[in-house]
């Protein structure tokens, strides 16, 4: 059995907010597997234990650029160390230029994007200059280019959430409404086909374990799990979500009423999946005093 260290318990505690002893028990039961331990705690404490999955820590900006005909666009995320840098005029101008370059040139990857020419040099040149000027690390993290089947529509919320939607049919207002909905509801995919099988299976396992602990009959477990999975899919797939401006209809119903469909969408949330290192100032001072 893998050794359960204090740092492992601390990490699981930070991920889930579960009591320390429960974290240790879960890690022991999972034989040190952090993901499995988190799943065990979800069974015991509900979805609160999965809070780390949506925790966002890094700073930066998301920007979108769409060509005039609405047929080609890009969304980019560029990270900085602090929100102060993310509000810097030079930094914001750089992000906008990178988004425009991505939409124009359609680079294959971040390395190719970094080599593109913008005002004053390559993306990498300007990034390096900004680091020297502002004094913070700046990273071109990710981007996506969309060639539309319909027409591209975007929504950016405070530079922190960006959405790019390929809307077939409908009008600009419908597109904006759906893009804003995506930013608010944060669907994982357009429909159930885009949800990874392992994620669905994890939901089934959790549902079955919770049903067992609640004393439900063995014969009912599969039915309960099926219901839980269907509820989960309705919550995380765009077409099944209730429209945020009118929850009496789903996005799918809204689209049908407007003779429209969505070919694809991309959503970026600044820092999604990045954990910022948080310094314990008191511990740092104490450690320094021992030197």
From Swiss-Prot:
It is found in: Cytoplasm. One of its GO terms (cellular component) is cytoplasm. InterPro entries: EF-Ts_dimer_sf, Transl_elong_EFTs/EF1B, Transl_elong_EFTs/EF1B_dimer, UBA-like_sf. Keywords: Cytoplasm, Elongation factor, Protein biosynthesis. Residues 82-85 are annotated as: Involved in Mg(2+) ion dislocation from EF-Tu. GO terms for molecular function: translation elongation factor activity. Pfam families: EF_TS (PF00889). It comes from the Bacteria. Associates with the EF-Tu.GDP complex and induces the exchange of GDP to GTP. It remains bound to the aminoacyl-tRNA.EF-Tu.GTP complex up to the GTP hydrolysis stage on the ribosome. Belongs to the EF-Ts family. This is Elongation factor Ts. It comes from Methylobacillus flagellatus (strain ATCC 51484 / DSM 6875 / VKM B-1610 / KT). The gene is tsf.
